[in-house]
Amino acid sequence: MALLIIWMPGIHLFNGSCFNHTVIVFDQRGIANSTVGSKPYTYPQLANDTAGLLDALKIPKADIMGYSLGGHIAQAFTISHPEKVNRLILVATTCGGKDGIPKPPEFLKLQADVVNKSLHNIPITQELKALNVASLGSGWIKLHPETAVIPANTTSLQQLKPGLPPDIANKQNNLGSWEKTNWSGACDKEAKLAKPTLVITGTDDNNYMPHGNALILASKIPGAWLVQIKNAGHAVVDQYPIELSKIMNTFLSTTAPNNSMIH
């Protein structure tokens, strides 16, 4: 059966009959239940962690998917360990560096305010509402206005996820600091990937990973597929899981290399 290794939160994307591949999902260091470790947070290090996982599982090669920050790691992994990659799926991400489109300054400030206020137990209801709208996109909000509601007097992400232990909630609150990692980007290396690649973006992702980055990615990777989802924001994997499952299945079945089957 074909095997897909991913780093992303939307595991429900692969539940049900729309996706017919075996999927391995894991938490990178410092995320959810994975320990922080002693090594610095860099994309090359996280890529090496992924390679180590494959080695530990005795999986020589797999299809790789990365969503958002995971897309950075997936690119770094494919560049540094091409022998372990069959195909590449990049969702709501960027190749970074000088060619990448950065987050708007006002959005970076908003993210920083959420982290700082939540750590000091200051209500962040309005800030989270703004983040939520940015994540979902204006088109989705118009179709589903109820999804923009945030409980009043929310002071941390843990309140939105009551079952989340405080230490894990704090890790997630500080996740934005990861993006300050000294990463020069992968735009100048994309042409060397030489792997069948699918790039997916929501057309309303204007803040987290501006959707123009997907066009840049697709233009730099030879033969890349580009899919733009209307009325979808950065949360495209949560908004259109069935549609994305079908798109990925089509890509994986159409571009299937001879050595992609793992028995």
Give residue spans per PLM region:
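Conserved alpha/beta-hydrolase "acid-adjacent" motif
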Residues: 206-213
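Hydrolases whose catalytic domains are alpha/beta-hydrolase-1, hotdog thioesterase
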Residues: 73-77
